[in-house]
Regions:
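Activation segment/activation loop of eukaryotic-type protein kinase catalytic domains
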Residues: 41-71
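Conserved end of the kinase activation segment
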Residues: 80-90
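Conserved hydrophobic alpha-helix
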Residues: 16-23
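Activation segment signature within eukaryotic-like protein kinase domains
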Residues: 12-13
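Terminal C-lobe "cap" of eukaryotic-type protein kinase domains
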Residues: 144-166
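Catalytic-loop of the protein kinase fold
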Residues: 24-41
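Short conserved helix-turn element in protein kinase catalytic domains
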Residues: 99-107
């Protein structure tokens, strides 16, 4: 596996945050953010692939998923999806956070576990400050986002801006 430089990772993250901002502005959530769905073009620009689970989101209230379905890949699921409520913009941003942990070479404490309840508990209880400072800042920002709130995209982008010192 090729290791990416920090600048390249930050550039990828910025591109994906912008992709999600665009998807969200159209009233949709991706629902399956993970490293395997991040594609790079010849110039190294990142885009999101596999929109097969994408769905419209609601901002009216916290809605229980009547289908009792979990949308996405277990390792990267958001707390909302674990709780069986419909995914929102926050859900995508949290899933991106778990993806960013791995892009920066971190290990998710639940990686390889198969018990959904154990994974859900670990995600709720994980001390995000164990990760890279940028990743921790990002995850804290996501955790501060309300279920129906618009993510603070500009603040998230600033965390990974090129002129930010490592």
């Amino acid at each position: 596996m090729t290791t990416l430089k920090q600048d390249a990772i930050c550039s990828i993250v910025v591109n994906i945050i912008r992709c999600l901002q665009c998807i969200h502005s159209l009233g949709f959530v991706h629902c399956d953010i993970k490293p395997g769905n991040i594609l790079l073009d010849k110039e190294g620009n990142a885009v999101l692939g596999d929109l097969g689970l994408a769905r419209q989101y609601t901002t009216s209230r916290r809605l229980v998923d009547k289908n009792n379905k979990r949308y996405g890949t277990l390792t990267y699921l958001s707390g909302d999806v674990h709780a069986r409520v419909l995914p929102t913009r926050r859900s995508d941003m949290e899933s991106l956070g778990w993806t960013i942990v791995e892009l920066f070479g971190g290990k998710l404490p639940w990686r390889g576990l198969k018990y959904i309840n154990t994974i859900e508990t670990l995600k709720k209880e994980v001390d995000v400050t164990i990760f890279d400072d940028r990743v921790a800042s990002y995850l804290l920002l996501v955790r501060a986002t309300g279920y129906n709130d618009e993510p603070k995209y500009n603040e998230m982008l600033k965390i990974f801006a090129k002129d930010k010192p490592s």
